[in-house]
Design a protein with these regions (language model features):
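N-terminal binding-site loop/beta-alpha segment at the start of enzyme catalytic domains
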Residues: 1-85, 121, 165
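Active-site beta-loop-alpha junctions enriched in small/polar residues
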Residues: 19-21, 50, 85-89, 128-131, ...
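A short acidic, helix-capping loop that chelates divalent metal ions and anchors anionic groups
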Residues: 51-55, 90-94, 134-136
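Surface-exposed, interaction-prone regions with an acidic/low-complexity signature
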Residues: 79, 83, 90-91, 96-98
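Glycine/proline-rich, positively charged
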Residues: 94-179
Length: 179
């Protein structure tokens, strides 16, 4: 497998996507996919607190739980680069923290919840799933403000800085950041 170094983190050029684990794939199938990826030199996997897709309150967090169970069983945490994401403002996800936001309290809680499900004490790449600003979601054109004021980017970044300083995350990112 080709390995690329990004900001000091060595990652395989192929990333194992996990968004169907817990909805379209069972835990056993997820573990088979992780075994296969590891056997073929893939060391990078992407997940999110809202997974699996299609997102529902009943299945939320299952993907991270499946990963955590596999890591606990196999003891291979150090061999993997794990990326996960916090869910920002979206009325469809009101079952997360009574309406997820990218404010300090929600980011810190989301990270702690992901760490618990992943059964690890750090996340290699912690991303905001969508920015807390107008953006297209799932191909939506335009943007409708849903009432709540958006969290200032500075507050989001300071919360991420706190997580980094505490050793809970190594790097930060933004998923779906296209305006």
């Amino acid at each position: 497998m080709n390995i690329k170094t990004i900001n000091g983190i060595e990652v395989s050029k192929i990333c194992l996507g996990t968004m169907t684990w817990g909805e379209q794939n069972t835990e056993a199938q997820a573990h088979e996919q992780m075994n296969y990826a590891a056997e073929h030199g893939i060391n990078f996997m992407d997940t999110a607190e809202m997974y699996p897709v299609a997102p529902r309150a009943e299945t939320q967090g299952l993907t991270e739980t499946y990963i955590g169970n596999w890591l606990a069983k196999n003891g291979q945490r150090e061999q993997w680069v794990i990326a996960t994401k916090a869910t920002g403002h979206n009325p469809a996800f009101n079952y997360l923290r009574n309406g997820p936001k990218l404010n300090r309290a929600h980011i810190l809680a989301a990270c702690d919840d992901s760490l618990r499900r992943l059964q690890t004490d750090y996340i290699d790449l912690y991303q905001m799933h969508w920015p807390d600003r107008p953006t297209k979601m799932f191909g939506q054109l335009g943007y409708v403000q849903h009432g709540d004021p958006l969290t200032p980017s500075e507050e989001t970044l300071r919360a991420l800085e706190t997580l980094g300083s505490s050793g809970k995350i190594s790097a930060i990112g933004l998923s779906n950041g296209e305006p």
